[in-house]
Amino acid sequence: MGRRRAPAGGSLGRALMRHQTQRSRSHRHTDSWLHTSELNDGYDWGRLNLQSVTEESSLDDFLATAELAGTEFVAEKLNIKFVPAEARTGLLSFEESQRIKKLHEENKQFLCIPRRPNWNKNTTPEELKQAEKDNFLEWRRQLVRLEEEQKLILTSFERNLDFWRQLWRVIERSDIVVQIVDARNPLLFRCEDLECYVKEIDASKENVILINKADLLTAEQRSAWATYFEKEDVKVIFWSALAGAIHLNGDSEEEANKDDRQSNTAEFEHSSFDEAEISHSETEHLPARDSPSLSENLTTDEDDSEYEDCPEEEEDDWQTCSEEDGPEEEDCGQDWKESSAADSEAQSRKTPQKRQLHNFSHLVSKQELLELFKELHTGRKVKDGQLTIGTGWGYPNVGKSSTINTIMGNKKVSVSATPGHTKHFQTLYVEPGLCLCDCPGLVMPSFVSTKAEMTCSGILPIDQMRDHVPPVSLVCQNIPRHVLEATYGINIIKPREDEDPHRPPTSEELLTAYGYMRGFMTAHGQPDQPRSARYILKDYVNGKLLYCHPPPGRDPVTFQHQHQRLPENKTNGDEIKMRPGRNKKVKQIENIVDKTFFHQENVRALTKGVQAVMGYKPGSGVVTAATVSSENGAGKPWKKHGNRNKKEKSCRL
């Protein structure tokens, strides 16, 4: 049976309702000749929008003000400028960068750190805390006014007052204050006001800038920075925590191998004795050989339990280990004083005094670094017989914790790229008479031009990046094209004929080539540019893509000695030399239409008549047997199938 239809009466009501609705709509907008009481010849008070408006957005406020002023807006369709996506780099032009640098120099004096207010024995703890809060609040307001009025960009800085309180206490009890900076951009991570604050507290305290990751610089680059800081009357030391750790690991492996060889020799010599004699000989021999290592392990365990897992203390109860020593420990401290004095006298005889007056550009080792610290401070010490070195100030990824672990010879501080990872300062004794006072890593305020510079410097986390175009564009501007191609083994698309042939590649060109090479593709089959950007930026921060900022007054292009080592391709047709055994990658053609039109190499035409058969062309003369044999040998006999004399069909062309 077919589908039963609805009764006819059911659709009549809907038809009448639809007709009535259409009539009402048509009469609403048309005039009628019928008489009505609504003349519409006055102000319609019944249809006013009497809704109260107490708050409105900026756009609504602007439109309402324009309506009250009687301003009419007309769309302008002339002078339209389309901004392509590749032009949105987020970088500054040369004129803008020079203007911002001038503003940085003019407002350098406002870039300061909070000071601890003056206090005396009559000041109560509540009054001191309130004064510290007031000074800290005024300092933050000053930085906010600097950003708003001058339109300057500041780096992220520490906004927790408790961290600054620990900074004040560490400076007060330190003899040498060490700032750890990155060798690729020392001026960005240096805080000049911290050096002034140290001298304000005590003129006998010394300031030192420890330039970490100096192994990334060449000897000429280190010499240039040493000369610059020498003119600024600042002591700098070139240091590499990673190289020092590798050297220490190599020494430990050699010592372990030496101990294994000695143990094997001892076992071979005593193999002829019985078990009782062997056990007796081992008990006599092992303590004399392994006692230093056992003592080091015991001290290591004690130090780890004492410093790494120490609970958080109150601010009024912060004391170092030397302040809580008993009478027995005071005798030990007296021995430390005598040994440290003897060491300093011996070192003063060995090392020439001119080393304290000049900055040397060579890369120091761990032992040389400790000797320089001992020679640097010659005034009155905070604690007699003990040299206290305050460390820990610096941005993330500059190597604060790695430096301390390398100096101590084992892991004393956990390493992290997060600011504020160390919650409280701790004292670590390197040797008798030399103490490291590790302060939580404080991030000082500094000037930057763009947010992209902060991302490329490692200040902002790369994984939390919102827009990848400006940082990658900055990488393309700093790293030449041939260095990028040689580092990743890619071919970046060349500029068009109407563009500058020496322009840097855009972020899209670099990320597209890198994404194709690594296989980072989206669901739509396009290169995953944000994912590729994270890999490239991490390589830039880690130093795989190396760019070193020069001292003021030096040319940034000629300062990059590491870029001049790689040969630059002089012509566009040159290809990167590949390793033997690998297939050459296909070059990308920037304009496939022009290449196809002007370079038609395989042009064929359909002709009729006598054609070349078996290598013979009409009018070419007598065909020799050698020519026929060569033609036959060049082909594949198993592909002929007896179709040699048949003409090719036109549909196959």
Curated annotation (Swiss-Prot):
Record field: compositional bias (Basic and acidic residues): 258-288
Pfam families: MMR_HSR1
Reaction catalysed by this enzyme: GTP + H2O = GDP + phosphate + H(+)
Presence of keyword 4Fe-4S: no
Biased composition (Acidic residues): 299-333
A GO molecular function held by the record: GTPase activity
Major localisation: cytoplasm
GO biological process: nuclear export; protein transport; ribosomal subunit export from nucleus
EC id: 3.6.5.-
CDD domains linked to this entry: HSR1_MMR1 (cd01857)
Compositional bias annotation for Basic residues: 16-28, 637-647
Domain CP-type G residues, every copy: 164-445
Record's GO cellular component terms: Cajal body; cytosol; endoplasmic reticulum
UniProt free text on domains: In contrast to other GTP-binding proteins, this family is characterized by a circular permutation of the GTPase motifs described by a G4-G1-G3 pattern.
Family indicated by similarity: Belongs to the TRAFAC class YlqF/YawG GTPase family. LSG1 subfamily.
Protein name per its UniProtKB record: Large subunit GTPase 1 homolog
Gene source species: Macaca fascicularis
